[in-house]
Amino acid sequence: MAYERFTSAITLLLHWRNRLDPYWKLARGDRPVGFLLLLWPTWWALWLAADGVPPWWTLCVFTTGIWLTRSAGCVINDYTDRWLDPHVERTCTRPLVTGTVSPRNALLMFATLMLIAFGLVLTMNQLTVLLSVAGLFLAMTYPYLKRYTHLPQVYLGLAFGWGIPMAFAAIQGKVPTLAWLLYIANILWTTAYDTWYAMVDRDDDIKMGAKSIAILFAELDLVVQGVLYTLMLLTLCLVGLRATLSHTYWISLISAVALIGYQFIIARRREPTACFRAFMHNNWVGMTIFAGIALATTH
């Protein structure tokens, strides 16, 4: 009897695992790099706003909220891209394409994730709650941009960095100039690394009529990348000067320059797999800058 109960429990667990696995993949739970690329800039903001380690509850709310909103963003992105994904090699096996998740269930999942995230935001102050509404608008409208403009990467930067003004609002009750400088730096960074991502899908996107910076600038893509990363680093220099950060921050920026340079070495021939590696490598850039900020604000 005990053995039968054990095998029944294992069978039940495997059944639910198989049922939930497509939803986990839809939310990109199996690909944490997107979460990390969203996490680092928000942590930059939290540590700068608090001038050190932020309050534990605020840190928990923002970290959990980042995972929830990033997952929700992936769900709504796949929902709006279900016309395109079957024709792109990298995305043709996504759950909405294969039918393992229905469009209706995807929308329900998006709504559930966003409601939980909003519930967490409600524990913050009024300004943070108001800013979160703008963040919801950015998250919901981003997936449609690639149909109408060659600059969806810029809009992704607006959406991905919105945790920065929210973090300052939560801790300081205002959004100072420092927050907007950091926000601009993150827009430039996101635009740059998502252009690597767009270079992976460029050929398929051209066939399907989708738009991106990689398509717009064609052979000048690497030049544009260089300009974006340079402007990002210069803006982060302004952040360091305005916040009067110590030498550890400046060391982290120098390290970030080396890491970014390595991306151009990786992707110099524009091969899709190499461009994807360059995209993934930005996790180390974000982490390095965070380490510099965290050490510079340690008292």
Swiss-Prot record:
GO terms for cellular component: plasma membrane. The chain crosses the membrane at residues 33-53, 56-76, 107-127, 151-171, 180-200, 213-233, 247-267, 278-298. One of its GO terms (biological process) is ubiquinone biosynthetic process. It comes from the Bacteria. Its cofactor is Mg(2+). One of its GO terms (molecular function) is 4-hydroxybenzoate polyprenyltransferase activity. CDD domains: PT_UbiA_COQ2. It catalyses: all-trans-octaprenyl diphosphate + 4-hydroxybenzoate = 4-hydroxy-3-(all-trans-octaprenyl)benzoate + diphosphate. PANTHER family: 4-HYDROXYBENZOATE POLYPRENYLTRANSFERASE, MITOCHONDRIAL (PTHR11048:SF28), PRENYLTRANSFERASES (PTHR11048). This is 4-hydroxybenzoate octaprenyltransferase.
